[in-house]
Amino acid sequence: MDKLQNIRGVAFDLDGTLVDSAPGLAAAVDMALYALELPVAGEERVITWIGNGADVLMERALTWAREERATLRKTMGKPPVDEDIPAEEQVRILRKLFDRYYGEVAEEGTFLFPHVADTLGALNASGLSLGLVTNKPTPFVAPLLESLDIAKYFSVVIGGDDVQNKKPHPEPLLLVASRLGMMPEQMLFVGDSRNDIQAAKAAGCPSVGLTYGYNYGEAIALSEPDVIYDSFNDLLPALGLPHSDNQEIKND
C-alpha cells in the first residue's frame, strides 16, 4: 500500500505485539492482590486490563477485586468490608507490591511471539531503523529485552516513565521518530491494541495492527489500522523483504 512505500524506520509496541507477557503480569497482579487479602483475578481477566501502563492496571485490578469481594461476601451472607484505606492509597500500595513481584517473575513469565526474533533481525539487517514504544514501566524494559536477546535490534527504546503522556497520546511516537531522525510519516508503527493505533494516527504514522494481541478483547479491525496482519513476519513482504509464507492483508 502507498503508506508503506517510503518507510525508513519501524517502531513497535511490546506487550501483545513482540511478547506474550500476560503470564508474568497476571502472576504479579495476583500476588499483589493476595498480599492485600483481596480476590485474585487470573490470567484471562488480567489480559483484558493490559495496555495503559502499570498504574491503570492496578486501578483496574483493585476496582474488580473490591467488587468481587463485596459480591462474594454478600453471597455468603456476610456484611460488607468497611474500607478504612482509601482506594487511591490502596492503588499506591498495590503498585508497590506489583513492582516487587513483577521484578521477580517478569523474565520467566514473558515469551516472544512466533517469528519475532527472525523478523526483527531481517528488518535490522535491511538497514531500517527500529524503535520500541511501550507503556510498561521503564525499569522493567531493558532487562526484559536483554533476557529475550532482542535489545540489540533497537536504536531507540521509550518506556512508560520516559514521557509525560503515554500511548494513546502521540508523544512517545513523536519522540521515537525524532530520535531516529525521520518524519512521523516515514516511521511505521506496529501494535496490537487500540492505544497503539490511536497513537499512530495522532502522530501521523502509518500503522499495522496485529490480530493476536490483547486489545481488551476487541478486534483490532475496529481501530482501523492501515494494515492488519495475523502473523508478525507478514511485515517483511510489506516492506519489500523476502517472506517464505503467504501474507494475508486484511484491508488496504
From Swiss-Prot:
Mg(2+) binds at residues 13, 15, 192. GO terms for biological process: carbohydrate metabolic process; DNA repair; glycolate biosynthetic process. Its EC number is 3.1.3.18. Pathway: Organic acid metabolism; glycolate biosynthesis; glycolate from 2-phosphoglycolate: step 1/1. Specifically catalyzes the dephosphorylation of 2-phosphoglycolate. Is involved in the dissimilation of the intracellular 2-phosphoglycolate formed during the DNA repair of 3'-phosphoglycolate ends, a major class of DNA lesions induced by oxidative stress. This is Phosphoglycolate phosphatase. It comes from the Bacteria. SUPFAM superfamilies: HAD-like. It is an enzyme of class 3 (hydrolase). One of its GO terms (molecular function) is phosphoglycolate phosphatase activity. The active site is at 13 (nucleophile). Pfam families: HAD_2. GO terms for cellular component: cytosol. Its cofactor is Mg(2+); chloride. Belongs to the HAD-like hydrolase superfamily. CbbY/CbbZ/Gph/YieH family. The keyword Acyltransferase does not apply. It comes from Salmonella choleraesuis (strain SC-B67).
